[in-house]
Every structure is written in structure tokens, then in C-alpha cells.
Amino acid sequence: MLEPGDDAPDFELPDQHGDLVSLSDFRGEHVVVYFYPRADTPGCTTEACGFRDSWDEFEDRDATVLGISDDPVSDLDSFAEKYDLPFTLLSDEDGSVSSAYDSYGEKNMFGKTFDGVFRNSYLVGPDGTVERVYEGVSPDGHADEILADLDG
């Protein structure tokens, strides 16, 4: 698992509009990189809407939010539009970025084993280093937890 003080792995992924976005594009500001299993499912919607509802507070702190899943771009576009999400969603269909962030691997659900995205988040500082790691987060209140850490 990445730890505070580690360099956050840079990446380049397509966003919900198909445009390529890199972590390094946001150098100089805080970035919340949050990994979620599947767009438009109950937990992931709760988490995304928490970030949406707190968006102004993130902007007030010069912080941005990047949500990453292994969904295709078209699903991310629909998800962002349906819930009026103001932040960037990124498609990591091959799981390579999620893996680099220790957020992809074997999961068990309903007696089935499969590979998928873990619900982890990272607060990346303006210098590109990991400031905080949130492992196995609860979708409820996660945005507020990160805002409190930004104020810390």
C-alpha cells in the first residue's frame, strides 16, 4: 500500500468525455484520487454524490477530485450526467492505474471471486506526494472526512 510521503504514481487516463487527463496536470493543488468499483451502483453513487454536494468546499480549499473506476468512458459520461457530477471521472479499464495505487485485485462477493477495484482514496499534496491514505472507505461521509483532513 502506498503510504504518506510516497510519490503518487502519475497516470494518464481518459475522462468521461474521452479527453486524456494526467495527475501531473494538477501539480500545485491538492488532489483527491478516489477509486470506486462501479458507476451508478448504490455505494458508488452515494460516494460520488457526497463529493458533488461538497464540491464548493473542495474548490474553496484549492482541491480537486478525480474518481477512477474500470468502467468504460461511455458509462462514466452517463453517470456524471445523471447525477450532475462536477468533477472528473477517469476510465481505467485495464486496472493498471488502480493496481499502481494498490486499489485493484481479487474480490469476493456473493460467493464469487473476481478482480475489481477496491474503494480506496488518496489525498495527494501540491508537490505530488501522498499526504493521506484512506483504505476500504465507507461511501457515507467520506468527502467530509477528506475535507476535515484538508483543514487539519
Name the predicted role of every residue range.
Residues 1-152:
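Chalcogenol-based redox active-site neighborhoods
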